[in-house]
Amino acid sequence: MKSLTYFVVILLIFSSITAIGIDKNAGTTEQSPKKEITVFRTFLQPKIYEKDSFFELHVEGMNNNIFIPGQPMLPVHTETIVLPFGVKIIDIECEVQNIESIILSQKIYPAPQRIIIGKSISSDIPLMDETVYNSNKFFPDNWFDFYVGVGLDDNNKHASLLTINTYPFRYNPMSNTVKYVKNINLKIDYYDPSINIFPETSTYDLVIIAPPEFTGDLQRLVDHKNNIGIKTVMQTTDEIYSQYSGVDKPEMIKYFIKDSLENWGVKYVLLVGGLNNLIWANPREDRNYGARDWRIPVRYSNLLDSEPGYVSDLYYADIYKESGEFDNWDSNDDGIFAYHKGFSLKNDELDLYPDVSLGRLPCRNNNEVKSVVDKIIHYENNADPSWFNKMIVVSGDGFLDQENLDFEWDTNGLPTGQYTIFAQSINPEGISGPIDETIVTLDKTQDTKLTFNHDDYLIVPNFPQYPASPVAKIMSVSNGDILGKDDYLYKPGEGEAYCNSYYGYANVEYRDEILHIRGKTYDPKPYGYTTNISVWIKNSEGVIVFEDQRNHSLMYYEGEWATGEQMLHERAGALYYMPEDFTSEILWTSNGKWTGQSDVINSMNEGSGFVFFSGHGSPRTWGDQYPGIPGNRRIGSVTGLANVALSSPFFPMNKLTNDYKNPIVIVGGCHNSMFNITLLTTLLDQRGTKSTWCYGIPTPEGWSEWLTRLPKIGAIATIGNTGLGFGVLGEWCTVGGVDGWITTEFFNQYGTEGYEILGEVHKQCITNYIDTFGKRDSSDIQTVQGWILFGDPSLMIGGYDTN
């Protein structure tokens, strides 16, 4: 997010004027004169491309798209204007010039769905939002929209953040008409705040909040920070509770943090404490918070679209909302914090921009405190590029984004007999894979018998060794099946064909004597995203009775694009953004370098500055899938790293030997950073009804907290999701928001934008995410709320160079 320079432009011809008025009296004083900014934008005519019987609009100079799932994916220009902290926007006037229109012959392509990572996909996922596509109104409703937040600018200064989305293209789905403008002029009127509530110089940079029982072991960290020039103070929870009031203990702590910003000029807040027991502890008093069994209490989000709440430490960092007011995360004062469910009028309006860089060390006892303090001090005092300047990435194929091939073989008029269906795929390099053969009987006197199969792993030579030649597999009919006298339809569920509910690529269908031949085609190698597949059918005499092909069939291995170094739709994977002096070790399922935990552990044992896992997770394990997910997830999955296992070694993380060569770990997936579990709460949740996400496997601590608190070994810090993670299938996996966007943004902020302090990188990722995607979809809200930093927010990445 960069500050912009603006100039006033006088327009001579206006075609349309729109103004949004706001309460002009609220938050203003006679000492705050009205100010004005005018922004002028010029847009080029769109280029139209056909895609899957839809149209896509591409326009040079646009930096975003509408990514609200199922709604028309129109180009957007998004910009964030940095204004003084606490400004009051009066109104924004939009003037447009030169409106033109074009009529399309096909619908605009819908924005991709956000899929819960690792969870079965609902069969009612709408590919198109019918409320929009069946409407006779232009979408979006206006040529622009905006939202105002309060957070930190590029220089870590408190500011108001005005994000404006301009929509030069608006679409009427009923008439299939696109209106577009060449010029948009925005005039913004606002009042400056009358006073600055923050000190010019900081008394303290870092405040550590901890229970009294941890202060003795934390004093070493306080002394260390002060010695290296990070002015640090420690405050106990008991002291805070005795001095502050609030509806509960989390709010008392939040008020203390607010005072720390306004009185001391604090930049970083470190919370030290998790649950108080590994065996059993009560994770929450009610739907809003947990305190009694917590060293440091937690706030739960009540975003209920996907799960019954999750811990959000963003609550402690998001202090202010528009006009600089305190944001208590209960905007409608109904006593339910951070409530969100669908499009309910009861949803709380949240700012979500962090106003301070905040992290947590979720220690449960003094031994864990000693371990993490020891690692932090050693890390910052012993910078060593020989092991730090290396990045490890681990990933595979996140989703089975197979297109619906749907070859239609019309058997009308064909004689009874045996027929052999052949399929073969070829990649752009001209390499052909093995031929898949399926023998069926055509006999209209018999009952139809069709069976689904998913055994493409049998086609891959030496499975699971990769890379391999292209794969073609017919799934909707099997050897020995009978095409008979009656119709047949079967839709395999997620347990048989992952993501089939979304694509329908595996549906078994025989109707009106037409067999719909469906299956998979993919190229199992790094970045092998396109293949051509040919299908032909011979009768018992070897005569071809049917042949067809599908060209440029796409399948993306989402996690590999997120972690890799190539560009996709003008956004690259993590390695692309890293400094040139960094080396990389790429552990992908498609390159054959990741086949199990030993590959990951051996690589981490050598030490590295960063490890990026992008895939599927839970509180006890992380993994992903082989390319194409052969045999579906049960066969096609591979474990990357677990804290608890059912066979030896029972605690795989403990096998790490990377003493004091501790990486910053970014993990993409569900619940890896969930830290409100214990051994008994997970053991007793056999069916998952208590949402511990371990399904009866006793897990005393979550994946990220375990990796972070290990003595000497493991991570120096971990960033991941406390709740469900979301992903985007296929080609928009790095651009379309949620997990694939925010995780790669970390490396953009560190490697390209140059942020060196851990908490500032984390804070900037959340800020940029909200700038780019806003807060309209619940998956966007959950992405930023649940993305927690386990580590010291004031940590100098790589340590301090003593020279």
Residue ranges and their predicted role:
Residues 24-403, 430-431, 436, 443, ...:
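Cysteine-dependent hydrolase recognition
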Residues 524-537:
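Solvent-exposed loop/turn segments flanking beta-strands in beta-repeat/beta-sandwich domains
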Residues 409, 461, 517-523:
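Aromatic/hydrophobic beta-strand junction motif of beta-rich domains
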Residues 511-517:
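Structural beta-strand segments of beta-rich domains
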